[in-house]
Amino acid sequence: MDKKSYLSHSEAVILQAIASSYKYGFDIMDISGLPSGTVYPALRRLEETGLVESRWEKEGVAQRAQRPARKYYELTRVGKEALAEALKRYRLLDRLVPRVPRSVKPSTERG
């Protein structure tokens, strides 16, 4: 079996939450309704298996906002394929976590 066959419902919800654009952890929790104890371990697993990739925003952006730098997550090509399969398996996923419009891509390089 391939990577996408092992998606849990929570992982599928997380993939759906970040499908439209880069998201950081709190955004993912807000969109998905899942707690941090579910989201962050799942994001680590999804990144380890190549379904998502992460990037840190530029330090200057965070400094101007007077907060720590955010780590943003985005689906990989394999992650998009896994989400497509998950949408077939979990038919209500689109209703539970509607796709949000693509937002402006954050500045993710450190500088």
Each model region followed by its residue ranges:
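A generic structural micro-feature
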Residues: 6, 65-69
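Residue-level signal for threonine
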Residues: 8, 75-76
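A positively charged, amphipathic N-terminal helix/segment that binds anionic biomolecules
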Residues: 1, 73
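Amphipathic alpha-helical dimerization/coiled-coil segments
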Residues: 78-111
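N-terminal helix-turn-helix DNA-binding core of bacterial DNA-binding proteins
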Residues: 2-40, 44
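Short, charged/polar surface micro-motifs in flexible loops or helix N-caps
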Residues: 20-24, 48-49, 78-80
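Beta-hairpin "wing" of winged helix-turn-helix
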Residues: 49-66, 74
